[in-house]
């Protein structure tokens, strides 16, 4: 997500709920997912996650990209093991400092290319631009983190083949500088689980598939999470659908605001029970009410002291 995701894109999601019934829904202790049958999915076997659970941070839009993260408060809440940091493409210098600080405070780091103006785009050139950004900036950012190639690329309407083709090209570019896991946000603002699974395993003859096996599929889960491919709001069966890809899976974002219709809490609990990493939205940086600490950067970007907000336990109790 982003400040714009929570003010612009989140508003966009709200409009989709009102106008089309589609809305935004979401790194990394991963489950090696197992094959599911199409008619009656088998339970996904539980495995301990590779990374611990944690929280999202979205600092690009506040205090020139240099807000105070409140590390001391975060460290006092020890269920937070992983931080997913969203990076606007013009914030490389700032992001280097964010990543260094997260390392020095002992966190597992997921770094996410986030371009607020193109969330949900099917334009493959935008995904290629993200890949080239990583190629240019990975070493500058200091390494030591997992790459989330691009936040929420791909609409509810993209086909498995188109999604796979675009990601094959983008992943090949990133591989010139990085050999670790690559997190792939599934299409439809993180909600089209069946599309993503088919993009990996292939669901039709001759279909293009994502060929790189060192990837993790990431869903984003909110109350308005809509699975257009299934014509309904997301439910726990979508966790099994995504698992049928045979790749590790995670919930890269979750929160309790933005639309209604999906049991976001039950879905997150189910994913966690299967061993998936879950990452709450957000420690700080949301443009609305989903900030675990107060003051929010949106209200005071220069704040240096923080306390728990009323939203804190919505996320923390899930971790």
Tell me the role of every PLM-derived stretch:
Residues 3-20:
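Bacterial N-terminal signal peptides that target proteins for export
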Residues 26-48:
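Bacterial Sec-dependent N-terminal signal peptides
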Residues 67-80, 87-114, 119-149, 161-175:
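An active-site-proximal structural segment forming one wall of the substrate-binding cleft
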Residues 41-85:
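N-terminal pre-catalytic segment of deacetylase/amide-hydrolase enzymes
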Residues 2, 12, 28-32:
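Glycine-centered signal
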């Amino acid at each position: 997500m982003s400040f714009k995701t929570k003010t612009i894109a989140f508003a966009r999601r709200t409009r989709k709920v009102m106008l089309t019934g589609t809305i935004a829904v979401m790194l990394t202790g991963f489950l090696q997912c197992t094959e599911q049958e199409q008619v009656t999915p088998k339970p996904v076997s539980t495995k301990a996650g590779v990374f611990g659970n944690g929280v999202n941070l979205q600092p690009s839009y506040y205090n020139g990209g240099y807000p105070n993260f409140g590390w001391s408060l975060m460290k006092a809440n020890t269920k937070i093991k992983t931080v997913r940091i969203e990076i606007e493409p013009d914030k490389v210098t700032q992001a280097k400092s964010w990543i260094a600080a997260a390392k020095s405070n002992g966190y597992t780091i997921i770094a996410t290319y986030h371009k607020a103006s193109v969330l949900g785009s099917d334009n493959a050139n935008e995904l290629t631009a993200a890949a080239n950004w990583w190629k240019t900036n990975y070493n500058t950012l200091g390494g030591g983190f997992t790459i989330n190639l691009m936040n929420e690329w791909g609409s509810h309407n993209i086909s498995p083949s188109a999604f796979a083709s675009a990601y094959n090209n983008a992943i090949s570019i990133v591989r010139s500088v990085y050999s670790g896991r690559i997190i792939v946000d599934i299409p439809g603002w993180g909600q089209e689980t069946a599309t993503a699974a088919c993009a990996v395993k292939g669901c039709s003859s001759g279909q293009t598939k994502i060929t790189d096996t060192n990837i993790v599929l990431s869903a984003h889960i909110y109350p308005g999470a809509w699975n257009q491919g299934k014509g309904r709001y997301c439910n726990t069966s979508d966790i099994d659908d995504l698992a049928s890809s045979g790749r590790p899976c995670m919930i890269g974002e979750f929160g309790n605001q933005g639309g209604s219709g999906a049991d976001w809490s039950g879905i997150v609990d189910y994913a966690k029970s299967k061993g998936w990493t879950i990452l709450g939205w957000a420690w700080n940086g949301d443009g609305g009410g989903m900030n675990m600490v107060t003051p929010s950067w949106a209200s005071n970007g220069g704040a240096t002291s923080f306390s728990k907000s009323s939203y804190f336990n919505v996320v923390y109790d899930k971790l």
